[in-house]
């Protein structure tokens, strides 16, 4: 039986209504009509299960937009060199770039600012904790989204330590108690090695900021030689040189070594990023079980705790020939619904994914996400209430290296006060040479 004219018109009209409804329901502010259908984006990313989980779901993005993606995963230790090389080459090999926040300022000139895109699509950086949002910004411009970001927590052996330390004095007391009890374990794992990634500044910043000190003063000069800052630095180093509660290998430890020390049952406490929890209770990586590992907020130094936060934003390369399509990808990649699934679903496309990292304020407080991850997001949210990031200036890598060297030498027995003062003098020369200060 053939269609009458009225039936045909009704059918077409119904189809148009359905198409319009489907387009209106396109999520995350993605553009209607697949305007970038057939585009292929190249994504540079650090190696992590979190991003494995996103990559394994990117067929959802392709179905919505017609845009395909090709991911290149680089170990963290090699990523900075790769990012720097991409900026120098300026050939747009990668459309979307993942980097550590402190690498942002030296590379900001070739990372697209996304503020106009965000305004057009109704996206606000207020969806992130202030420290995370700040870490993806440079000189008033937003350079990307902090998709991987971390709060610091104190992890401890709850089978050996009944109550977590509330202060660094408590850390020392607990350490002495473990030593006096003859426990065959080092009380505390720290990482003083001058490794080139400035990891030995991570805990030092907690002491500095809690004491009321700053890295730079209001005029941009080194400020870590104020009396309160020097005292804080001395107290940080004294955990190793005077209290002697640290693992003896802390001088040579980088962060990964310290984590391994904890996971192998050789250290009883470690202040480290929250993401480490999943590996600490993973039998393929750790000798410990969930019954042995607990976590709490970072200890206070003096009357308060001020923590260091870090992030690894994703940005659009200014050299990309597919900037608009890359923005579509960032909108999808950063949406809170996807982030929630990635922190609660333990298998994607047949692959096991264990990830507890979320960066949206809503997800940090989400009861389902917390229930799936031993409430570690709630602890991280508490840590982030009073947190800050490393200075966002192009000269920071050089200045940070000077500081990192001073910390390592102080932990090895040098005079903390003299080394930090000399570091300030060196840093001042660097900043003057760069025109940052007069």
Task: Locate the predicted segments by residue.
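Short, solvent-exposed loop/beta-turn-alpha elements that line the ligand-binding surface or hinge
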Residues: 31-38, 116-128, 190-195, 211-231, ...
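C-terminal lobe and pocket-closing loops
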Residues: 28, 34-35, 275-289, 302-402, ...
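Short, well-ordered beta-strand elements
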Residues: 37-48, 67-72, 95-96, 188, ...
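Extracytoplasmic/periplasmic solute-binding protein
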Residues: 141-147, 152, 172-231, 258, ...
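Hinge/lid segment of periplasmic solute-binding proteins
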Residues: 24-35, 100-151, 163-174, 186, ...
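Glycine-centered hinge/linker elements that transmit conformational signals in sensory
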Residues: 174-175, 219-251, 294, 298
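Extracytoplasmic "Venus flytrap"/periplasmic binding protein-like
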Residues: 60-128, 137, 159-166, 260-261, ...
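Conserved C-terminal helix/tail region of periplasmic/extracytoplasmic solute-binding proteins
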Residues: 26-28, 34-40, 68-69, 381-438
């Amino acid at each position: 039986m053939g269609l009458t004219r009225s039936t045909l018109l009704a059918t077409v009209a119904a189809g148009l209504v359905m198409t319009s409804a489907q387009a209106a329901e396109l999520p995350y502010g993605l553009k209607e009509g697949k305007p970038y259908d057939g585009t292929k984006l190249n994504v540079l990313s650090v190696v992590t299960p979190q991003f494995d989980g996103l990559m394994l779901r990117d067929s959802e993005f392709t179905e919505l937009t017609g845009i395909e993606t090709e991911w290149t995963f680089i170990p963290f230790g090699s990523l900075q060199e790769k990012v720097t090389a991409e900026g120098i080459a300026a050939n747009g090999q990668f459309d979307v770039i993942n980097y550590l926040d402190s690498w942002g300022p030296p590379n900001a000139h070739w990372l697209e600012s996304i503020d106009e895109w965000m305004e057009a699509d109704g996206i606000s950086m207020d969806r992130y904790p202030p420290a995370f949002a700040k870490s993806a910004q440079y000189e008033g411009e937003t350079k990307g989204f902090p998709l991987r970001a971390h709060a610091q927590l104190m992890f401890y052996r709850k089978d050996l330590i009944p109550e977590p330390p509330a202060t660094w004095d408590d850390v020392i007391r607990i350490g002495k108690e473990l030593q006096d009890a003859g426990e065959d374990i080092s009380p505390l794992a720290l990482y003083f090695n001058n490794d080139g990634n400035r990891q030995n500044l991570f805990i030092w910043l907690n002491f500095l900021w809690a004491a009321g000190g700053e890295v730079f003063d209001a005029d941009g000069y080194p400020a870590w030689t104020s009396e309160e800052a020097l005292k804080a630095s001395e107290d940080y180093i004294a955990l190793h040189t005077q209290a002697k509660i640290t693992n003896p290998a802390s001088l040579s430890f980088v962060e990964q070594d310290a984590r391994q020390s904890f996971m192998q049952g050789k250290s009883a406490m470690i202040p480290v990023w929250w993401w480490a929890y999943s590996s600490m209770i993973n039998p393929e990586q750790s000798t410990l079980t969930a019954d042995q590992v607990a976590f709490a907020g970072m200890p206070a130094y003096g009357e308060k705790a001020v923590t260091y936060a870090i992030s690894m934003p994703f940005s659009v390369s200014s050299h990309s020939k597919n900037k608009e399509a890359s923005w579509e990808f960032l909108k999808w990649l950063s949406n809170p619904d996807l982030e929630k699934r990635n922190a609660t679903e333990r298998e994607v496309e047949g692959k096991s994914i264990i990830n507890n990292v979320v960066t949206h304020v809503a997800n940090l407080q989400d009861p389902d996400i917390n229930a799936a991850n031993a409430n570690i997001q709630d602890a991280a949210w508490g840590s982030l209430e009073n947190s800050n990031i490393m200075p966002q200036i192009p000269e920071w890598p050089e200045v940070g290296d000077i500081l990192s060297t001073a910390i390592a030498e102080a932990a090895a027995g040098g005079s903390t006060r003299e080394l930090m003062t000399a570091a300030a003098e060196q840093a001042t020369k660097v900043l003057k040479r760069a025109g940052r200060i007069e």
